[in-house]
C-alpha cells in the first residue's frame, strides 16, 4: 500500500472521526439538562476527537487519488475500530464510573455494534447522560449497519445485500433506492428515524416515562438492547411495554429497503411479495409458539402470561435485540438454549439484526431440499429456486463459505472460553451473544459480562466486530493476496 493511498485512507478516517465527534453533543445536552458532571467528560471527548479528526481530514484533503476497492475494505474495518475506541473514551476517563480501559472498550464495542452486552453491574445507577449515550451508541451503530449492508458492501462485491441485489427477486433488484451513496444513506436515515419515532411514541403510550421511552425506542429499532435499567424491560412489569418491544424487534428485523418502498409508495405489497420476509416471519412464529408452549407446560405462567413473555423474549433473541425480562435467567435451560440457537438465525438482510440472516438459511434449506430430490432422481435436471429465480453456483458458494466461516469462528471462540475455565453453557451463551450481536448471556454472564477476564473480553470484542461486519471485511485484511499490487 503506497503513501498516496495511505493519505486517502487517513483522509476518509479523519472525516469519519470528525463527524463522529459531533455525536458527543446530544449527551452533553442531556448532562446539562440534568446538571450532571459528565458534561465535562463528553466535552473533553468532543474537543479531542473533533481536533484529531479534523486535523487528519484537512491535512490530507489534496491527495487527488481515487478510492480503490482495497481502500474500501480498510476504511470499513477502521470505521468500526475507531468508533469503538471513541465510544469507549468518555466511559474510560470518567473516574466515577471506575471502568478499566478494557471494560470501557467492551462497552463501546458492544454499543456501536448493536450487541447490547454490558460489563456494568448496576446500570440503573448510571447518570442519565450515560444512559442516553449508551442507547445513542446503539442507534448510530444501527444506522451504520444499514448503510454498510445496503449501500457500501455491495459496491465492494460482498455482503448479503450484494447476494440479494445480483441474484434474488425483491427490492434490490427492481427498486434500487437512489443512484448515489449519499442519497441512499439519507433515505435510509429518514426511514430508520421514522421507525424510531414510532417506537418511542408507542412506548410512551404503553406507559413508559419519556426519558425511558426515548432511550428504549432508539435501542429497540437498532436492535441494540441497551436499557436504562439493570432489569431491562422487566423493570416496567408491563405487558403493553413487552408487546411494543417484541413488535418493534420484529419490525426492525425487516429489510429497511422494504420499509422505504412501503412508505414512499404507500402500499404493503412489497412486504407481502418478499420471500425472505415471509420465511423470516414463519420462523419467528414457530419460535414464539414453541417457547410459549414450553414455559406454559412447566407452569411458569398462565396461558396469557406465557404468550406475552415468550413473544417478547423470543422476538428479542431471534432478532438479536437483547432486551430481556427480569427473570429470563430462571427459565428452563433447554428453552434458553433453544432461544440462543435461534439468535444465529437473525432477521432479514438489510436490517440492523445480527446472525447469519434468514435469506442465507432459506437458500441453504432450498439447497438441502434440492440434494434430496437429486438423490431421488439422479438423471433429472433440477435447480435451486428461490422466489422463482435460479440460485447460481456463485451465490451458493458464497452462502456456504460464509456459513462455514461463521460456524468455525463460533466453535473457536467457544473452545477458547471453555479452555479458560468457563463452563460450556456460559461459553456457548457468551459467544452466541457476542458474535450474533444479541447481547444476552446465560450462566455466569446472565447478569453482566464483567465476570469475564480481560483476555476473554478482548476476544468477545473481536467476535462482536466479526459478527457485525459479516466476517469477510476483517479476515480479508489478513490475506497476503489482498496486499499484493
Curated annotation (Swiss-Prot):
What NCBIfam families does the annotation carry? 2a38
Q: What is this protein called?
A: Trk system potassium uptake protein TrkG
Q: Which UniProt keywords apply?
A: Cell inner membrane, Cell membrane, Ion channel, Ion transport, Membrane, Metal-binding, Potassium, Potassium transport, Transmembrane, Transmembrane helix, Transport
Please list the GO biological process terms of this entry: potassium ion transmembrane transport
Protein function? Low-affinity potassium transport system. Interacts with Trk system potassium uptake protein TrkA. Requires TrkE (sapD) for maximal transport activity, low activity is seen in its absence; no further stimulation is seen with SapF. Transport in the absence of SapD is dependent on a high membrane potential and a high cytoplasmic ATP concentration, suggesting this protein may be able to interact with other ATP-binding proteins. Can transport potassium and rubidium.
Q: PANTHER family of this UniProt entry?
A: TRK SYSTEM POTASSIUM UPTAKE PROTEIN TRKG-RELATED (PTHR32024:SF2)
Presence of keyword DNA damage: no
Enumerate the subcellular locations listed in this protein's record, separating them with semicolons.
Cell inner membrane
Q: Which residues does the annotated region (Selectivity filter part 1) include?
A: 113-118
Q: Where is this region: Selectivity filter part 4?
A: 436-441
First-listed, main subcellular location of the protein, grouped into a coarse class: membrane
Entry-linked InterPro entries? Cat_transpt (IPR003445), TrkH (IPR004772)
The family note in this entry says: Belongs to the TrkH potassium transport family.
Q: Note the Pfam families from the entry.
A: TrkH
Query: What does the record give under GO molecular function?
Result: potassium channel activity; potassium ion binding; potassium ion transmembrane transporter activity; potassium:chloride symporter activity
Look up the record and report any one GO term of the cellular component aspect: plasma membrane
Q: Which residues lie within the membrane without crossing it?
A: 101-112, 113-118, 209, 210-221, 222-227, 238-253, 303-318, 319-324, 333-344, 345-357, 422-423, 424-434, 435-441, 454-465
Q: How does it sit in the membrane?
A: Multi-pass membrane protein
Cytoplasmic side of membrane: 1-5, 61-68, 154-180
Region span, Selectivity filter part 3? 319-324
Q: Name the source organism.
A: Escherichia coli (strain K12)
Positions contributing to K(+) binding: 114-115, 223-224, 320-321, 437-438
Question: Periplasmic compartment: which residues?
Answer: 33-38, 119-127, 206-208, 228-237, 325-332, 420-421, 442-453
Chain ranges passing through the membrane = 6-32, 39-60, 69-93, 128-153, 181-205, 277-297, 392-419
Its gene name is trkG
Residues annotated as region Selectivity filter part 2? 222-227
